[in-house]
């Protein structure tokens, strides 16, 4: 995926104006401009729906990859993050959400540059993300690892 870096200025402005502790790019934002395959849109929508149910995240898209954090927010949870791979940023957002940090979604301009519609993601990657998601659910909702001490 191509995410033009000039988008970052608007994200930084939201952090500077104290409107958010975390600003993330969202393909689901109404003002996003997307060149994105239908199969990926369907898979993404299903996964985001699952995340909303499991974690009560007030965001529609966790996986776009463009994110900005206030240093103090990220420092407060980074030692708690155990996940590697594609679900890493989900765990970060869940941990921040558990600690009541403000997460704001911003539109993205995205050009999908892969021909087959799936890019580098393989079935084993998808299965690993689901496995990691359940581990994050366990840490967040059963063990309550991300709550403030």
At which residue positions do the language-model features occur?
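Acidic metal-phosphate-binding loop of nucleotide-sugar-dependent transferases
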Residues: 1-2
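Acceptor/aglycone-binding surface of glycosyltransferases and processive sugar-polymer synthases
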Residues: 5-86, 113-123, 127-130, 144
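Phosphate/oxyanion-binding loops and surfaces in catalytic or ligand/nucleic-acid-binding neighborhoods
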Residues: 53, 99, 136, 140
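Catalytic donor-sugar/metal-binding loop of nucleotide-sugar-dependent glycosyltransferases
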Residues: 57-58, 80-84, 93-111
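Secondary-structure boundary/capping motif
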Residues: 70-73, 101-102, 136
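DNA-recognition element of transcription regulators
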Residues: 90
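C-terminal, non-catalytic tails of nucleotide-sugar-dependent glycosyltransferases
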Residues: 131-149
């Amino acid at each position: 995926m191509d995410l033009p870096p000039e988008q970052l200025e608007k994200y930084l402005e939201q952090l500077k104006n104290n409107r958010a502790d975390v600003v993330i790019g969202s393909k689901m934002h109404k003002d996003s401009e997307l060149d994105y395959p239908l199969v990926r849109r369907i898979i993404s929508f299903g996964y985001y729906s699952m995340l909303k149910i499991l974690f009560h995240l007030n965001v529609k898209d966790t996986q776009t990859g463009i994110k900005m954090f206030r240093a103090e927010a990220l420092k407060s949870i980074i030692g708690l993050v155990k996940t590697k791979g594609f679900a890493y940023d989900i765990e970060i957002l869940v941990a921040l959400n558990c600690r009541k940090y403000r997460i704001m979604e911003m539109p993205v301009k995205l050009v999908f540059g892969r021909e087959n519609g799936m890019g580098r993601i393989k079935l084993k990657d998808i299965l690993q993300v689901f496995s990691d998601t359940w581990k994050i659910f366990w840490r967040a909702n059963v063990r309550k690892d991300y709550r403030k001490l």
